[in-house]
Amino acid sequence: MNPFTPDTLRQLAQTHDTPLWVYDTDTIVARIRDLQAFDTIRFAQKANSNTHLLSLMGAHGVVVDAVSPGEIQRALAAGFTAAPNAQGASGIVFTADLIDAATLELVVAHGIPVNAGSIDMLHQLGQRNPGHPVWLRINPGFGHGHSNKTNTGGEHSKHGIWHTELPAALAAIASHGLKLVGLHMHIGSGVDYSHLQEVCPAMVDLVKTSGADVQAISAGGGLSIPY
């Protein structure tokens, strides 16, 4: 049942003025319960970084992804930490292809795992804090998305470590004693989930051929909203 009846929306607009964004707690919690068939529900803050919503999701077991120092700060303000949940997933993971000095200090100070999209990031992090937990964002050589703007894989994408460079990335991890958590592939966003049939086996194959010891694999892209 849609909680937003015309009368309800009219009353809210009169009470709070407009423009006004309205969210329904029961609906959000219900969607979280639907997704709990997955091992981990990790919410990308770029979709919505409202700290009230983040706190609500955190209270129901959701963890978050941050792609900027601002998003890290918002996650911290909403009550998230780098500590693992019951499933072993860190409350915050920082994902990027580049990292500046200030952000480097921030992730080190809070022990936030870094999902590294470049080998340079691994060297920077390893030199600053040997043993830090990391993920590897891998570009598998193919992409997918409902448009070119949302296609984040393949040879024309700036994102991720090219799949043939995985041995070099693992060597960088070993040289600095970094702790590899898992592999991540985000090749695009869209309404078609068939690409997961390519992404997940590609990650499994990379793990097998590389001999990497990982705790998890992660397929990015998110779940679309039925507009």
Predicted features, each with a name:
Residues G131-G143:
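Glycine-rich, aromatic-flanked loop segments that form ligand/cofactor-binding clefts
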